[in-house]
Each structure stands twice: as structure tokens, then as C-alpha cells.
Amino acid sequence: MITKNDLNTIFKWAKNTDFPLKKAPTAEGYSNKDIYISWLKGAGKKVFIRKKIMTEEVADIFLKDEIIFATFSTFESGTILNPHRDPDVYPCRYKRIQLPLKIPNRNHCFMIWDGKKVLW
């Protein structure tokens, strides 16, 4: 099970890591600006983890079966993502956890869930 302590460890590590970024492939109309990502974990027939940029403690957390896929993403100021649903790429249901690392203006960085504005 992923614990709050695990999430705090990932958060602290990620805040101090310089991620190698690549432009994310996105569908037409998904976003008004480019999004950049750094792949961290993928799981399918085999599990792949980008250990080169992880501490041993963080790699151990990412090795847990509960984490199926992980990326670091960065959004430019003013990025708008239209409401969307991620495709079902795994055979079982999964939850998505988003850990905002840097929020320049709390009132301008938010998500709308079920018609309600959610601030971090």
C-alpha cells in the first residue's frame, strides 16, 4: 500500500530533482499549450523504472505494485486542459494521484471537478 509517508518522500525528492523533459504527445484540442513530461515508471508484462534519476528510497516506492505508471509533468503558465477522461489502458481500475510541486498563484492553479473549483 502507498502510504502518506511514501507520498511525502516522493514529493520531497521531486521538488529537488531536475527532470529530463520531452514534449508530451497529446490529442488535438487536449490543451492550449504544450505539455512536457518525464517518464518515471511503466508496468505491463515487465516493469520499467527510471532509476538513474531516483534515490534508492524513491525507487523502492516506485517498485510497489500499487504504482502502475508514473510521470513528472510540467505545464506552462496559462495552460488550460479541457475536461477529459484518460483512456482505460490497464485491465483493472486505478486511481490517479497528482502531487503539485510548485504553484505560483493558488487562485490561478486549480482543477474543476464535478463543477466545483478545487484549489491546491
Placement of each model-derived feature along the sequence:
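Catalytic core of non-heme Fe(II) oxygenases with the double-stranded beta-helix
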Residues: 55-120
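Non-heme Fe(II)/2-oxoglutarate
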Residues: 1-64
